[in-house]
Amino acid sequence: MAQLETRTEPMVVNFGPHHPSMHGVLRLVVTLDGENVIDCEPVIGYLHRGMEKIAENRTNVMYVPYVSRMDYAAGMFYEAIVVNAPERLANISVPKRASYIRVLMLELNRIANHLLWLGPFLADVGAQTPFFYIFREREMIYDLWEAATGQRLINNNFFRIGGVACDLPYGWLEKCIDFCDWFAPKIDEYEKLITNNPIFKKRIEGLGTIERDQAINWSLSGPMLRASGVSWDLRKVDNYECYDDFDWKIASEKEGDCYARYRVRVEEMRQSLKIIRQACEMIPGGPTENLEAKRMATDDKKSDIFGIDYQYVAKKVAPTFKIPNGELYTRLESGKGEIGVFIQGNNEVTPWRFKIRAADLNNLQILPHILKGAKIADIMAILGSIDVIMGSVDR
């Protein structure tokens, strides 16, 4: 008796675009053979707002409030890179105290970014409970931002050419250390719940594997690169701001799968806590209360401490600051990877060219490659492990 052969026709399915609060307005045109993915075409651009052209028609002071809306989970990083580019082009130095304040804000943002990634990622693979624990700690970071900048999630508008908008408020460093003391055991709690959970490990181990050479050839960065065995972090490589003052290590894994990317991000939160603690202890001038006491002791309203006016921790750059002739590319390590800005000035208040390199756009490009051969149920787990924010991808 002849054996019947079952043949299936490929089926094209549209995933998304989803609501921005989920995985963003990303559309995946997926070709399926049964439950197996045989092709995937990402469709982007739904959230394109012309951020580069806006930058070319605004002064730097006017443009800084815009940029946190690109990656609305990590706005501080874009504020930093947008002011770093003209600073380097014009050779503007940053006071040491301002540099320490920047590092504090960036590392808090790195933790907030990873927490915002971790909660939805766990929900994607079926673990709902940790989602609520993670958002509890994230709110504490936003409380610190609100005290320092007046805003919580986006539109902090805190970074300035030459420094930051203002000094830290009274008691802020103490509250920041309190947060570190609170959050460190919470990471251990997450790991007890998640890391060695047999259901979680079986769900994502070996899923979406990226080899070391593939990660390099696809220009991946951040946890996507370090999870594939490449120990590359711009905080160590470029030593921007004052990261060379601190003792910390690069988090990396070798397996290159979704589980390795999870392990890298959890370890990065631990390392960020180490940096924050050291910055709080080593910040020039100490807490703001100490600076005020020194000013009152000297009876000098414009006390020059560490070469800066303590009331405004920045070199005061005029709103009509002209970007000098020249061009350069500057970069930094965000929670998602390398973000950079290519700026070209022509001695005008607005740049002639302003090109933004988003980490998640480069990381997203490998998605069709690692989805081929996967099951339809694994699509959201693999996409979630990449950590994309479509405002940053589309710009």
UniProtKB/Swiss-Prot annotation:
PROSITE patterns: COMPLEX1_49K (PS00535). Disulfide bonds: none annotated. Keywords: Membrane, NAD, NADP, Plastoquinone, Quinone, Thylakoid, Translocase, Transport. It is a peripheral membrane protein. GO terms for cellular component: plasma membrane-derived thylakoid membrane. Pfam families: Complex1_49kDa. HAMAP family: NDH1_NuoD (MF_01358). NDH-1 shuttles electrons from an unknown electron donor, via FMN and iron-sulfur (Fe-S) centers, to quinones in the respiratory and/or the photosynthetic chain. The immediate electron acceptor for the enzyme in this species is believed to be plastoquinone. Couples the redox reaction to proton translocation, and thus conserves the redox energy in a proton gradient. Cyanobacterial NDH-1 also plays a role in inorganic carbon-concentration. This is NAD(P)H-quinone oxidoreductase subunit H. It comes from Prochlorococcus marinus (strain MIT 9515).
